[in-house]
């Protein structure tokens, strides 16, 4: 039996970007998904109702007020019932198929992988040493950037085990609302790094970023 995978999508009143993300994911994904969970942090009931209408078969969580990205993730992950979760923000477009299968091979063969990136569009530095898991080639995200503060943790599209998530859960405990997003990634990544975890990166990029400029997340969260 294949390992169970749920998809968690964080969104904040960007319906068109969300639609593009989900459509491209469903077009390019080749792995059975147990459940889709969308968490809407807009505080806008009309926007949330629109999401429900678009995706009646998905689990749609509504935050009545804006609680921020990290708290939204913790809330959504509390509802995940599967062993693994594929994490997506609402502003990505998948352009290549077959990304979950190789990611799972890495995680299942290396228990110290905190997440597997399915995109490296910013060409973040990677370790020189190539690794292989059940025929899948990958590398670790390098530790030589950002003055050794960042350890490869990202909110970009990734797959992780719920076991690893719980090691440092809830993520909201490691930063404050005043922290900008990159610093929050650094702080959470530091917790995993101190426990011996690393981020794995597939050799190909399976998706591209479509958002950034059209966001309603506040600066401390997005």
Where in the sequence are the language-model features?
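N-proximal low-complexity "stem/linker" segments adjacent to membrane-targeting elements
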Residues: 1-23
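C-terminal catalytic/acceptor-binding lobe
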Residues: 20, 150-222
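Short, acidic, metal-binding catalytic loop of nucleotide-sugar glycosyltransferases
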Residues: 23-33
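A conserved acidic beta->alpha catalytic loop
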Residues: 38-48
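Glycine-rich, basic loop-to-helix element that forms the pyrophosphate-binding segment
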Residues: 63-79
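Short aromatic/hydrophobic "clamp" motif used to bind/position activated sugar donors
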Residues: 85
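Conserved donor-nucleotide/metal-binding helix-loop-beta segment in metal-dependent transferases, i.e.
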Residues: 97-115
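Short beta-strand-to-loop element that shapes/binds the nucleotide-sugar donor at the catalytic cleft/hinge
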Residues: 116-130
């Amino acid at each position: 039996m294949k390992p169970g995978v749920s998809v968690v999508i964080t969104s904040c009143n960007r319906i068109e970007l969300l639609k593009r993300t989900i459509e491209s994911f469903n077009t390019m994904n080749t792995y059975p998904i147990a459940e889709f969970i969308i968490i809407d942090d807009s505080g806008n009931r009309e926007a949330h109702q629109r999401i429900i209408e678009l995706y009646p078969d998905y689990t749609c969580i509504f935050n009545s007020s804006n609680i921020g990205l990290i708290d939204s993730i913790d809330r959504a992950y509390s509802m995940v019932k599967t062993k693994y979760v594929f994490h997506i923000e609402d502003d990505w477009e998948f352009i290549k198929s077959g990304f979950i299968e190789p990611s799972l091979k890495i995680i299942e063969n290396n228990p110290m992988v905190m997440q597997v990136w399915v995109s490296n569009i910013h060409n973040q530095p990677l370790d020189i040493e190539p690794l292989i898991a059940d025929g899948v080639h990958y590398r670790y995200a390098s530790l030589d950037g950002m003055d050794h503060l960042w350890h490869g943790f990202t909110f970009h599209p990734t797959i992780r085990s719920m076991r690893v998530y719980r090691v440092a859960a809830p993520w909201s405990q490691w930063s404050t609302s005043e922290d900008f997003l990159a610093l929050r990634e650094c702080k959470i990544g530091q917790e995993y790094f101190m426990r011996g975890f690393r981020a794995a990166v597939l050799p190909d990029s399976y998706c591209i970023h479509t958002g950034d400029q059209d966001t309603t997340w506040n600066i401390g969260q997005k």
